[in-house]
Amino acid sequence: MTTLTLNTSLLSSCRILAAFSGGLDSTVLLHQLVLWRERHPDVTLRAIHIHHGLSPHADSWVRHCETVCERWQVPLVVERMTLADNGLGIEAHAREARYRAFAQTLLPGEVLATAQHLDDQCETFLLALKRGSGPAGLSAMGERSPFAGTLLLRPLLRETRKTLEQWAVRHGLCWIEDESNQDDAYDRNFLRLRALPLLQRRWPHFPAAVARSATLCAEQERLLDELLASDLTDCITAEGTLRLSPLMLMSDVRRAAILRRWLAMRNAPMPSRDALERIWQEVALARDDASPCLRFGDHEIRRYQSQLWWIKSVAGQHETTVVWPVWQTPLALPAGLGTVQLVPGGELRRPREEESVSIRFKAPGVLHIVGRNGGRKLKKIWQEQGIPPWRRDTTPLLFYGETLIAAAGVFVTREGAAEDKEGVSLVWHA
């Protein structure tokens, strides 16, 4: 390996953020990117190091990375995080937190470069095989993939770890050794330390053959994407929900493929075959009068008006009152529901000087809303407006004193209607 396998056709810009742990792989990656920058002066290069706090050596690793980056004149961002147990297991949780930090650190126009290589690709394929994955899972990693509104590049994916080590030794590079990499209790370490050496002794080109299989799986998955694009368009609504009526006419295999692609579009974790079956049997085919719900981590799949919805789980707020002492400034809502603000220009009257302002999530009695004759209870209004059940006690209701003025994005009451041109609008940033 004498040059970086990255070329300008892979770049959406000339700005690169390199993931830099200080280990062998990322050290070789950063070294090659520094050489790339020397040959292309218009390239700007930064590095990011994640301090997980999992090792007693984590602080010394930060100092090592700072020294390397200072020597190579690469600006370094160090992100420190504390990992709480979220039920995913430490490997998955650390990876999730790491990539979340990458996404938050990327600047506009910047791409992320990571140091996965051919042996990593082989491990990823075998782990997916262990889980019983289909073509999508067995596609493993691509050299380029969408990430956080930009690109994630893996410019070393065709190189073996042995080749990377030869490069590092030849160029006198120094790297750290993470002691956790020697713990074969972790699945990936078990493959790297025990299984793959045995397989490669028998079949030296095993990783390359696995990479070819992963590429073929990826090609098959892209072909399925093309063939199912029309079906997917017919099934998905403007709100991103999935219409059930077309799915009812499909074969089990075709329907499962559509469900997987819809969930991928919603950035949901890829479901197992059993999970897909539960979605169909327990949610899609539930009784007409049921309100089925299936939890997936901090999200849910629900059915409403013959559509499937992928939503974030939020506890009902019907007993919550949020006082808005200064209504001219935005107000943060509980349970991650976002913010609301009153902005000039709209159909709501401004609060009178003696009226307190608050946000609530339930309203008693009979309500009279603008554009409708007669009064009706809030439950009836929600039904008429087609508001899904899980939004009915999480949609902000604006009160002046004890008077309901408006429901964000849904209705205005007669008592809340502006009488002049000095009205305001209730804007909800969920």
From Swiss-Prot:
Claim: tRNA processing is one of the keywords in the record: yes
The reaction(s) this protein catalyses: cytidine(34) in tRNA(Ile2) + L-lysine + ATP = lysidine(34) in tRNA(Ile2) + AMP + diphosphate + H(+)
EC number(s) on file: 6.3.4.19
Record InterPro entries: Lysidine-tRNA-synth_C, Rossmann-like_a/b/a_fold, TilS/TtcA_N, tRNA_Ile_lys_synt, tRNA_Ile_lys_synt_N, tRNA_Ile_lys_synt_subst-bd
GO MF terms, alphabetically ordered: ATP binding; tRNA(Ile)-lysidine synthase activity
Cited Gene3D superfamilies: 1.20.59.20, HUPs
Keywords noted in UniProt: ATP-binding, Cytoplasm, Ligase, Nucleotide-binding, tRNA processing
Keyword set includes ATP-binding: yes
One GO CC term on file: cytoplasm
Binding site for ATP: 21-26
UniProt record, GO biological process: tRNA modification
Major localization class: cytoplasm
Subcellular location: Cytoplasm
Family to which the UniProt record says this protein belongs: Belongs to the tRNA(Ile)-lysidine synthase family.
Domain notes: The N-terminal region contains the highly conserved SGGXDS motif, predicted to be a P-loop motif involved in ATP binding.
Function comment: Ligates lysine onto the cytidine present at position 34 of the AUA codon-specific tRNA(Ile) that contains the anticodon CAU, in an ATP-dependent manner. Cytidine is converted to lysidine, thus changing the amino acid specificity of the tRNA from methionine to isoleucine.
Protein name: tRNA(Ile)-lysidine synthase
Taxonomic source organism: Salmonella paratyphi A (strain ATCC 9150 / SARB42)
Gene name of the encoded protein: tilS
